[in-house]
Amino acid sequence: MKVILLKDVKGKGKKGEVINASDGYARNFLLPRGLGEEATDSNMHILNRQKEAERKKKLEETEAAQALAESLRNKELKMIGKAGENGRLFGAITNKDIATELKKQFKVDIDKKKVVTETIKQLGEYEVELKLYPEISTKIKVIISEK
């Protein structure tokens, strides 16, 4: 019996895959537990529409991330911090601070987890990588100056 998996099933397949399962396994395990449904023509049509919608959504997200990466490329983010002797900052500039400043200066909402940098503890210029989407990233220059 052909079955469309509704959830990941260990050893059988992932959600959305069509598998061949024995009739007993499908009727007694997969179908009653809501792990799969019979692969009828109407169910296959629904599955194909869902996959197409997911593909379009992923394409839109990729295009949006590429546009954002292009708009941020070679931008300079200026930040001000209090520093002591030798240009050492009181406190440090973290990825959260950079994400907040990006929102203020460029009106771009980026999650702090997508800002890839070491904690900045000195005044100066730094290259910071922004991972906007899998395989899409850009670099910006962060300039830390004293008040």
UniProtKB/Swiss-Prot annotation:
GO biological process, one term: translation
Gene Ontology CC terms, in alphabetical order: ribonucleoprotein complex; ribosome
NCBIfam families: L9 (TIGR00158)
Protein's name in the database: Large ribosomal subunit protein bL9
Source organism (scientific name): Clostridium novyi (strain NT)
Recorded family membership: Belongs to the bacterial ribosomal protein bL9 family.
Protein's job: Binds to the 23S rRNA.
PANTHER family per UniProt: 50S RIBOSOMAL PROTEIN L9
A molecular function GO annotation: structural constituent of ribosome
Any single Pfam family the record assigns to this protein: Ribosomal_L9_C
InterPro entries documented for this protein: Ribosomal_bL9, Ribosomal_bL9/RNase_H1_N, Ribosomal_bL9_bac/chp, Ribosomal_bL9_C, Ribosomal_bL9_C_sf, Ribosomal_bL9_N, Ribosomal_bL9_N_sf
HAMAP family reported in the protein's UniProt record: Ribosomal_bL9
Domain of life: Bacteria
Keywords: Ribonucleoprotein, Ribosomal protein, RNA-binding, rRNA-binding
